[in-house]
Amino acid sequence: MFEPFLLAVEGQEFLTGFHVEGPLAGLIIILIALLLLWIFKKVLKLVVVLIGAVVGYFVGEAVEPSLSLVFAAGFAIVGIWAMSGDKSKKKGKKQRSILKDADDWDDDSWDDEGDWDE
């Protein structure tokens, strides 16, 4: 049997030293799944930043080999900044549409001006 599910086996005192029954085992499995998802999210961000650093290194090698590590560090910093979240929320500003600032975006009065059939 797969070892993590041994906690859910009734009558087994594996690893914990106490008897685990259905609802508690389900709660433990759900909490472990949530922890793994949280860790995967963090690892995924780290992988994206590392890929950016490798791309920066290769760009640096193509441009100037002596600056390849500087390019890699720069791309890694940009990757960390990009993965840190939504920048507009941190500033407290709301995104506005271009149409909200325009005064006449729904002004149909130009249709009534002049007679085109003359």
Swiss-Prot record:
Compartmental location: Cell membrane
One GO cellular component term: plasma membrane
Protein's UniProt name: Uncharacterized protein AF_1991
Region (Disordered): 85-118
Chain ranges passing through the membrane: 20-39, 46-63, 67-85
Biased composition (Acidic residues): 103-118
Keyword hit for Transmembrane: yes
Biased composition (Basic residues): 88-97
The keyword Cell membrane is annotated on this UniProt entry: yes
Keywords: Cell membrane, Membrane, Transmembrane, Transmembrane helix
Topological relation to the membrane, as annotated: Multi-pass membrane protein
